[in-house]
Amino acid sequence: MYKEEFLVEVETILQAYKESFSSKTYSMESNISDILMESFGISASLKRENRQYWGRELGMIWQLIVNAIFKHHGTEYAPALKFGLDEPCDLICGNDAIDTKYRIGSGDSGTLKKFKNYGHLLRSNGFRPVLLLLRDDSLTAAITACKTGGWEVFENKDSFDYIFNNTGVDIVELLHYFENKFQIMR
């Protein structure tokens, strides 16, 4: 019916994926809260219902808040740079080209290549690429790719410190100021 060589090849593929699936571990990301989740009263269980949705939305909030902080309190603020259709960062503060991410959860080659290319593009135009991550549970391969691409990567408290050192705004204190005002009801 099927050639033995074919069956062995398919079996080898299936076995390799069985082992990969069996040994797959998931980050604790979905069980850990952060300052934005707390601002809205988003529980870990609610976030687990649709991680991609919450990650995308919380990432946009992070980007908008950081941008507003630098716009109103940063020195030498400028909006995002554009190179053709590409927008390799969210804002400029002096020589720092700042991009914001909630976390980097994708390790696909396209995403990693983009970070490397954008880092080189920004450096070649006289900027220091700075990546401000809200969380500290991003994929290690993604962080490595960013650093290889010339990005200065700050995670969690280091991001908060960077923001404070460049604007005087304590983002944790700022979000606590609005605590319980925007709790979602579900």
Name these PLM-found stretches.
Residues M1-I69:
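Interdomain/boundary linker segments immediately adjacent to catalytic/signaling cores
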Residues Y102-N156:
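Catalytic cores of nucleic-acid endonucleases
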Residues L134-R186:
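Domain-level recognition of nuclease-like catalytic cores that cleave nucleotide substrates
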Residues Y77-I92:
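Active-site metal-binding core of divalent-cation-utilizing nuclease and nuclease-like domains
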Residues L91-Y102:
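Conserved catalytic cores of phosphodiester-cleaving nucleases, focusing on short active-site segments
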Residues R51-G55, T100-S106:
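Surface-exposed cleft-lining segments at the edges of enzyme active sites
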Residues K71-Y77:
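Short Pro/Gly-enriched beta-strand edge/turn motifs at strand-loop
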Residues E57, I61, I65, D86, ...:
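Short, well-structured alpha-helical interface segments that form or flank functional binding sites
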